[in-house]
């Protein structure tokens, strides 16, 4: 084995903020369906505790053995709208409370799956879940929610987009954490290990382990060694680095699945930043030669980074999936925060960047007076990018405070500068409702 490779791997862990961001256990709740919501809630609690009871213990064991920090151990479950639909209840908060109770019992920080899939229309459970979302998220600490409002195959459910704009607006009047725990998707994936958008798809095995890695600091350090070189060498360097990062994720996932006696799912080939210095995707882009993220060339740099990470990672993992790409959450990336505060990065540029990377407008604070119709229109724009380009896009925005203020979240969530939003109205556009049809290139059968 190449001694230099061993040295580089040790440096990744000790000096460059490399970590496993999450081991997420996906759990099917289809066998917890019951006409009585209280019985369903108890079944949900019992199954999560039974299946994931040792998740934290095993995660800590593996981290200690390998000398790698495994930051989060999490759980995702079947979309609760499906489970709740079998009951006569008009509020699914009891199911959210059962999820929250189970999460606390097993010691995980978040549990995802208070979700609805409404890309082509509402069923009974979907409407009830969305209406109960503000209450359910306010009543729980660790439950995360998501709604899929569009897909390349079905188009965009604009009625759902309108409803989600209103839901986000309602939740903005409560705690700042409510909207930090809600993601609105187009082309949502069934095996996402990252919160807040994780849910366990109905096409998945009963219980699986998915792994998400994190390594922007590792990539930046590698690029520092090839300053001034051509893009060919830049891309090759990123690919080799991504291979090493993903290989460790694969090893951790295999070990976790064996010890928990659960099927191994996927490694998500994502670069996920944190607010820590040296763990920023924005700083990787700047290392490529940009004075600051947000300037002209940012989208091209991000496109190349995203593609090279996938090319390197796909060879290192048995199965890849999830969101797989570079994440650009504003509040969770110190380089992004600095770019927004300097005026170099705005929402319009972030929207352009989401065309070529993972997810979308993520952890962005906007002025609290922003109307629900404008929030819905932002969701519609992101959904359109995803639907037309056959990729996952999402919105996680926090209407709070006034433009220029800083919203403190702390921990992995960081600080969100309140960004300027276009004040021209989209109200008549959003009020139409209905469905934007699927694009012509989706018609492939």
From Swiss-Prot:
It comes from the Bacteria. Transmembrane segments: none annotated. SUPFAM superfamilies: PFL-like glycyl radical enzymes. Belongs to the UPF0210 family. Homodimer. The lineage of its organism: Bacteria, Bacillati, Bacillota, Bacilli, Lactobacillales. InterPro entries: UPF0210. This is UPF0210 protein YjhD.
């Amino acid at each position: 084995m190449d001694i230099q490779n061993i040295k580089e791997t040790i440096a990744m862990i000790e000096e460059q903020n490399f970590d496993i961001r999450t081991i997420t256990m996906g759990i099917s709740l289809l066998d917890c369906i019951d006409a009585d919501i209280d019985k369903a809630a108890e079944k949900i609690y019992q199954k999560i505790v039974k299946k994931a009871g040792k998740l934290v213990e095993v995660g800590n064991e593996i981290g200690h053995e390998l000398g790698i920090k495994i930051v989060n151990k999490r759980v995702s479950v079947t979309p609760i709208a499906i489970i709740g639909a079998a009951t006569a209840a008009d509020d699914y908060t009891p199911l959210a409370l059962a999820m929250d109770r189970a999460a606390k019992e097993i010691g995980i920080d978040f549990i995802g799956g208070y979700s609805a899939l409404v890309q082509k229309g509402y069923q009974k459970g979907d409407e009830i879940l969305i209406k109960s979302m503000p209450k359910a998220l306010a009543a729980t600490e660790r439950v995360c929610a998501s709604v899929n409002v569009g897909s390349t195959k079905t188009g965009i459910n604009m009625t759902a987009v309108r409803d989600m704009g209103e839901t986000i607006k309602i939740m903005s009047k409560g705690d700042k954490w409510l909207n930090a725990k809600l993601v609105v998707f187009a082309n949502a994936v069934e095996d996402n290990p990252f919160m807040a958008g994780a849910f366990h798809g109905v096409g998945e095995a009963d219980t699986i382990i998915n792994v998400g890695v994190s390594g922007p600091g590792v990539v930046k350090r590698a690029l520092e060694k090839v300053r001034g070189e051509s893009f060919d060498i830049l891309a090759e360097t990123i690919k080799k680095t991504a291979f090493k990062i993903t290989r460790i994720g694969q090893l951790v996932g295999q070990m976790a699945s064996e010890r928990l006696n659960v099927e191994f799912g996927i490694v998500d080939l994502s670069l996920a930043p944190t607010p820590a210095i040296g763990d920023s995707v924005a700083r990787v882009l700047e290392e490529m030669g940009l004075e600051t993220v947000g300037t002209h060339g940012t989208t091209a740099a991000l496109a190349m980074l995203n593609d090279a990470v996938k090319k390197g990672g796909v060879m290192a993992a048995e199965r890849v999936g999830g969101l797989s790409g570079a994440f650009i959450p504003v509040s969770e990336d110190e380089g992004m925060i600095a770019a927004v505060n300097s005026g170099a990065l705005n929402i319009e540029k972030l929207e352009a960047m989401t065309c070529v990377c993972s997810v979308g407008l993520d952890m962005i604070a906007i002025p609290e007076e922003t109307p629900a119709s404008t929030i819905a229109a932002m969701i519609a724009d992101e959904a359109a990018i995803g639907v037309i380009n056959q990729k996952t896009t999402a919105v996680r925005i926090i209407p709070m405070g006034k433009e220029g203020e800083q919203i403190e979240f702390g921990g992995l969530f960081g600080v969100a500068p309140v960004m300027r939003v276009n004040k021209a109205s989209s109200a008549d556009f959003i009020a139409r409702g209905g469905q934007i049809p699927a694009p012509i290139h989706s018609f492939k059968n």
